[in-house]
Amino acid sequence: MWSITNEPHSSEEASRNYFEEVTKYIRKLDSERPITGTMNVDVEDDKISQFFDVVCINRYFGWYVGAGKIERIYPSLKTDLIKWHEKYGKPVIVTEYGADTIAGLHKLPEVIFSEEYQKRCIEENNKAMDECDFVIGEHIWAFADFMTAFGLKRVDGNKKGIFTRERQPKTAAFAIRERWRKML
């Protein structure tokens, strides 16, 4: 599959003409392979996914949207997935989801940045995706923590990995292992 964009300004009117032309050109070069692009806008604002064969979306319910509100993740994502599928009638892949976690921070009840919160966040996302038969794939963001430019929102890098930068597992890694074992 050709993935030709990640989080473009797909709510802008100019994006419609641009991506229509780009996808036509790609289909001339390779008519066999499906085309996709990854969106981060609301479905109501999207102007380009009709040109793709598969809809890909990055979603961070419980993190960038409704941070700390674990109970809103499942209903928010499920509603969002259904809207995308109803609008375009195409398979959907959730290409990014997750929450930052400080390795070793354990809190009950789970609070943002705790390992328990990351685990629950991933589980709530998985529950919503599992109930939508048109969801054909998912990708947790990210495999491992990584360094980014310093900023007030990023202390010592991106911490959304289910493994640390040193490749040590966080609590969520064990939950994912169990999820994948059940799929075999």
Regions found by a protein language model. Give the residues of each.
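Short, small-residue-enriched loops and turns at beta-alpha junctions
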Residues: E7-S11, V43-D45
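Substrate-binding clefts and catalytic carboxylate motifs of secreted carbohydrate-active enzymes
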Residues: W2, R16-K28, T36, E44-L184
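Short intrinsically disordered, low-complexity coil segments enriched in acidic
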Residues: M1-E7
